């Protein structure tokens, strides 16, 4: 069972595991991942969709109709669409972001990859992304998939989370360390 091999837990982990096992059985793991990535991107772009997903105020049937319209418009169908509709019918659509993260972890485990969450101040070039993947592969011994998030508040550098390890090489952290040291000295 996939759930025994990975660290997904809770409601989102159970849903992600069920989706992963169905996708694996239907040989659609990558297709479902691509659909979920598209849905997550839509969530990031649309405040209305984010509100629909997170708010308990919407009636289940209204939420279901709206979700169906969105899925039809962006071309998400099959297993992915049915899964999102099940989440909606069960009033669990609010956990979709956690389900997507857990699904990605299951896919990475299935493919023998590690997944690193990388936060940068500005978007990295393809050359820099490849160099980062090579460096992380030398540390882990596995291919590394990157989830890159741009956060200008870190000022510069990057923060890498890989499993239970985290390396914070951000300029914000370095400046805060200097500030703290100056307070201690003064």
Swiss-Prot record:
Main subcellular location of this protein, as a coarse class: membrane
Membrane topology: Peripheral membrane protein
Pfam family, one: OSCP
Cellular localisation: Cell inner membrane
Cross-referenced InterPro entries: ATP_synth_OSCP/delta_N_sf, ATPase_OSCP/d_CS, ATPase_OSCP/dsu
Superkingdom of the source species: Bacteria
KW Amino-acid biosynthesis (keyword) present: no
Entry keyword Cell inner membrane: yes
Known role: F(1)F(0) ATP synthase produces ATP from ADP in the presence of a proton or sodium gradient. F-type ATPases consist of two structural domains, F(1) containing the extramembraneous catalytic core and F(0) containing the membrane proton channel, linked together by a central stalk and a peripheral stalk. During catalysis, ATP synthesis in the catalytic domain of F(1) is coupled via a rotary mechanism of the central stalk subunits to proton translocation. This protein is part of the stalk that links CF(0) to CF(1). It either transmits conformational changes from CF(0) to CF(1) or is implicated in proton conduction.
Protein name: ATP synthase subunit delta
Lineage: Bacteria, Pseudomonadati, Pseudomonadota, Alphaproteobacteria, Hyphomicrobiales
Gene name of the record: atpH
